[in-house]
Amino acid sequence: MLNHTRNNIIYAFMWLSLLVCAGCTSVSSTDAPDSTNEPKAGLASEASALPDVIDPDKSVLVTDDSFVCLSSMRPVRGFFVGNLLGNLEETVAAANQPAGAPYPPGSIVQLVPAEAMVKHQKGWNAKTNDWEFFELDVKEEGAKIKVRGSTQVVNKFGGNCFECHQKAKPQWDLICEEGHGCDPLPIPDFLIRWTQGNDPRCD
């Protein structure tokens, strides 16, 4: 019991440190600056001209129970994917497409336990490529959705998720990885891996 409590305290402290350092870490793998001289021509310019309008008829159902232990999801290059509509292989195929590809509806992407992004049906929100961002309260008994939405989701430390992810080049569908165009995360890999491996929902 003592060790269990101690582990929970350590987990909470490390997760707090992770978010404070990162500002916004929503579902991005560790990134690094582009080694090429190409401009970061992500979705920022074109997205700014689009209205932030949600079509509820195009929503994928997302509840607290949609978010599970990270080790129950499919690992892809240091982050984790799933699909709430049962199309896991399509999501994995998009994640593994060398030239980039749009993720299918129902896709869920997570880097760390307490933040996620979910892809709704086409037309849900053109500004975010139909992605919705989530901040979660994660405990042993499960996850609770604390904050959710399109462009206005800001975590408790002031990081705007969409503003981070819109810097990804168009072919990457707002997914941040090394070379995708997003700002690098000032977090060592070991800290991200430690946080992933200490998801309190996992046995």
Task: Give the location of each predicted region.
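Bacterial Sec signal peptide processing site at the extreme N-terminus
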Residues: 25-37
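N-terminal secretory signal peptides
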Residues: 38-105
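Sequence context surrounding c-type heme c attachment/ligation sites in exported
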Residues: 28-31, 55-56, 70, 76-77, ...
